[in-house]
């Protein structure tokens, strides 16, 4: 016996083996009932929480809509501002009727009619352009923009961006800008002094001295102006993208005859047709003749041989026969006939 028993106290405790044994059925049933109650409480709380979430979602998604017929009412200050804006827009719409539309770019020109003889007008202004009539009857016209020229106004002298030029018609190119007619035989001349010299042949009464050959009407001023070609598609036409005017009227005449005119002159040796009489004479003079170099090359023109020698330098020189005759003095070249 231990000390507890000696003192009259007793404590019964289960042994270690009994403690290891499984509990009775009563305790197990109690634990099962407790677990079932906790599960029911948890399920009830979850169901209640889901109902609350559904209610919150419905309240959040529900937005009251106003009927379509309701009108928006602004504050008094906003009403005043809106009235002022409406008045300003009305004023602007009234002013729009008085605004003149402007055309940006180069103005276009077309043929018109007016009392003072000027027949060129703007498309958007319909105002005649002031034009000067010079003494020889050629109409002068001043403009500041690049224009498209019709066939009817090709014979006008124009000033564009400070540069004056002239576009003669085909008739003026063939016969000259003007003709002088003899009052007796009606023969025409391109130059006034030639007409006066012709008049001397009709009698001594027409011989008024050398001063009479100068004349009072000379188209010298316009003949010195740069000229554009009137032929369509020509590189010297004003409508060409890379157009470039010719030096003067005489140069234009030669250009037109060579490029766009007939070729009445033909070489008697090779039959080549030429338009300018001077070109025909030069061609017949040198046709069939060759200029030889010491390297064996031959050229149809003397200038071509000179260019060949200048380009290749040493080892190239004129043929000995040319040097013997004087190559630098425009001697006759070696013939192939």
Swiss-Prot record:
Q: Which residues cross the membrane?
A: none
GO terms under cellular component:
nucleus
Q: Does the keyword Zinc-finger apply?
A: yes
Task: Zinc fingers (C2H2-type): give the ranges.
Answer: 180-202, 228-260, 265-287, 291-316
The protein's UniProt keywords, in alphabetical order, are: Metal-binding, Nucleus, Repeat, Transcription, Transcription regulation, Zinc, Zinc-finger
Name where it's found: Nucleus
What's one Pfam family the UniProt record gives for this protein?
zf-C2H2_STOP2_3rd
Q: List the ranges annotated as motif Nuclear localization signal.
A: 257-260, 300-303
Checking PROSITE patterns in the record gives:
ZINC_FINGER_C2H2_1, ZINC_FINGER_C2H2_2
Q: What is its main location?
A: nucleus
List, in alphabetical order, the Gene Ontology terms for molecular function in this entry: DNA-binding transcription factor activity; zinc ion binding
A biological-process GO annotation = regulation of DNA-templated transcription
Q: Which SMART domains match?
A: ZnF_C2H2
Function of this protein?
Answer: Probable transcriptional regulator.
Q: Which PANTHER family match?
A: ZINC FINGER PROTEIN WIP2, ZINC FINGER PROTEIN WIP3
Protein family: Belongs to the WIP C2H2-type zinc-finger protein family.
This protein is called: Zinc finger protein WIP3
Q: What is the native source organism of this protein?
A: Arabidopsis thaliana (Mouse-ear cress)
